[in-house]
Amino acid sequence: MSSSSFSIENVRSQFPALEKRQIFGDNAGGSQVLGTVAKRQLSPITEYLIETNVQLGASYKTSTQSTAIFDNAYKAAAKYINAGIDEIVIGASTTQVFRNLAAALKLQPGDELILTNVDHESNIDPWLHYAALNNATIKWWTPSDLNNPKLDPEQLRSLLTNKTRLVACTHCSNILGTINNIKAIADVVHEIPGALLAVDGVAYAPHRAIDVKELGADFYAFSWYKVYGPHISLLYGSKAAQAQLSSLGHFFNPDGSLMDKLELAAASYELTQAIIPLTAYFGENPKQTWDAIAEHEQKLQTRLIEYLVSKPQITVYGETSTDKAVRVPTVSFTVEGMSSQSVVEAVEAVSHAGIRWGHFFSKRLVGSILGLSDDGVVRVSLVHYNTVEEVDQIIVALEMVL
């Protein structure tokens, strides 16, 4: 994609699935895949399986080719987030890489872990599990404003002690769409010597560039299948933070990189190499490309949120500001007098919109903070290949069913 100008027509032409009449409004659950990653004739995934599907690391020609492709994919992934190649690991999902990370962290009895119930469960349950096994203590960082929950770094400071070992939080809620200030949070966490910050970037990564060095997080994870690629994930771990991890690998294997410590051969070779065309999509100047994406997405969320807040029977959760600096176009709401399930089913009955209802694995947020049942919220989650016209069609459908 050219970073000099944003053409929605050009963007949409690169996603074969968009040829359908379906309006994809459930992108926070998984985005559509670039044609360069999964084109119909000979995708790079298929090419890998046909031409170089052998074990890595051998000396014969096909293995050296396969190893080079795999290594180049790792290099592309590391460059994409401004990390060293020895600071990343590819996994099956963000849930899986966080569980591996929690298993590897050398927890001691009395260590304190600070979690937030704003998060997706993937960045909560692993820490609860291994804290219990190691007699560590859990503290909860709960937002003070339950109507518009945000993670306040100053509130976090009051929870920190010299026993704090790790803070886990989300960069952006997969329900609220609110962007949290990770750099400010990291600065507060690192006031405690040795304390670590683990960030779930899954709901943020489809919308903005990621620079892990600028953010200052010790660990950062996201899923490529929500960033226009195949169903794999990435975990970053700084070299300094890796010193606090044990290796999950076999005793005779090296443990000098995050991949050595945590991969457990879980990186699908054929899917991993698809990272190369995926990252190339953002062009030679990715920052400009992402800036253009943010501008377009602001138009989408402005149209949708302005409509929703104009309806007295609708409650929007999270930021009602349409400013791209504070939120992404993942928008959740409920309708007075209607279940979220019935709203979604009614919208789908009168339109081509694909949206969703529920708690989206952020059950603690939906139940404990928002005070909702498992029926949860209606979520419309948009990305840069959606159009203003599609948003208008969703609005028309909502008008018909409210």
Curated annotation (Swiss-Prot):
Q: Which residues bind pyridoxal 5'-phosphate?
A: T137, I138, D218, F282, G283
Q: Which InterPro entries match?
A: Aminotrans_V_dom (IPR000192), PyrdxlP-dep_Trfase (IPR015424), PyrdxlP-dep_Trfase_major (IPR015421), PyrdxlP-dep_Trfase_small (IPR015422)
Q: What induces it?
A: Expression is positively regulated by the cluster-specific transcription factor FGM4 and is induced during infection of coleoptiles of wheat seedlings. The fusaoctaxin A gene cluster is silenced by H3K27 trimethylation by the histone methyltransferase KMT6.
According to the UniProt entry, its GO molecular function terms are:
transferase activity
EC annotation from Swiss-Prot or TrEMBL: 2.-.-.-
For this protein, the record's SUPFAM superfamilies field holds: PLP-dependent transferases
Q: Does the keyword DNA-binding apply?
A: no
Q: Which UniProt keywords apply?
A: Pyridoxal phosphate, Transferase
Q: Phenotype on deletion? A: Produces fewer spikelets with blight symptoms on susceptible wheat cultivars.
- What stretches pass through the bilayer? none
User: Pfam families from the entry?
Assistant: Aminotran_5 (PF00266)
Stored PANTHER family: CYSTEINE DESULFURASE (PTHR43586), PYRIDOXAL PHOSPHATE (PLP)-DEPENDENT ASPARTATE AMINOTRANSFERASE SUPERFAMILY (PTHR43586:SF21)
Q: So what does this one do? A: Aminotransferase-like protein; part of the Fg3_54/C64 gene cluster that mediates the biosynthesis of the octapeptide fusaoctaxin A, a virulence factor that is required for cell-to-cell invasiveness of plant host. The 2 nonribosomal peptide synthetases NRPS9 and NRPS5 form an assembly line which likely utilizes GABA as a starter unit (loaded on the unique module M1 of NRPS9) and sequentially incorporates seven extender units composed of the residues L-Ala, L-allo-Ile, L-Ser, L-Val, L-Ser, L-Leu and L-Leu, respectively.
Family affiliation? Belongs to the class-V pyridoxal-phosphate-dependent aminotransferase family. Csd subfamily.
Recorded protein name is: Aminotransferase-like protein FGM3
